[in-house]
Amino acid sequence: DAQLRTEYSVKALTDAGVEVEQLDLQRGDWDRNKGQEICQNDLAKYGDQIEVVFCNNDDMAIGALQAIQAAGRTVNKDIYLVGVDALDAAKNEVAKGNMTGTVLNDAKGQATQAVECMEELLGGKTFEADHQSVYVDYVKVTPDNVKDFQ
């Protein structure tokens, strides 16, 4: 899931016509301190070349935010920061303008889809071998809609 998150985040930018140069890709092990350390090191190495930081969870994004602020950069002004999970702490940072956004891994949508698949199976429907996975779209949480999720 995390590899796909990264791949499709970059793809969304390129599909929108944004030129992308990936400066670094590291594992933050879902850890705030590691996210801060990686971002701090990258900011020291790449400086203003860094325009966007994608983190595959909000805790790492909050760590990255700490590094960004310590480096004197301003999210949504000279750098963008996106996390995943729509944790309360991240939604608060989005509302304050300190994060560009987060992405909700839609548990309610997943549950609904699971029930629909179960009903289809109980009704006798079979699924082909190459259709064994069902993907539920993530939900973007931005400053424009964050109040809907708090």
Question: What name fits each language-model region?
Answer:
Residues D1, K11-A16, D106-Q150:
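Hinge/cleft segment of the Venus flytrap/periplasmic-binding protein
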Residues D1-A12, V20-E21, R27-N33, A111:
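Extracytoplasmic ligand-binding site segments that recognize negatively charged/polar headgroups
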Residues E7-G17, L65, Q69, A95, ...:
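Class I S-adenosyl-L-methionine
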Residues S9, D24, G28-N92:
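Hydrophobic alpha-helical
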Residues Q22-L25, L81, T102, K140:
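Conserved beta-strand scaffold positions in the cores of enzyme catalytic domains, especially
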Residues L25, K96-K108:
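Short beta-strand elements at the ligand-binding edges of bilobed clamshell
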Residues D85-T100, V139-V141:
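Flexible loop/hinge segments that line or gate small-molecule binding clefts
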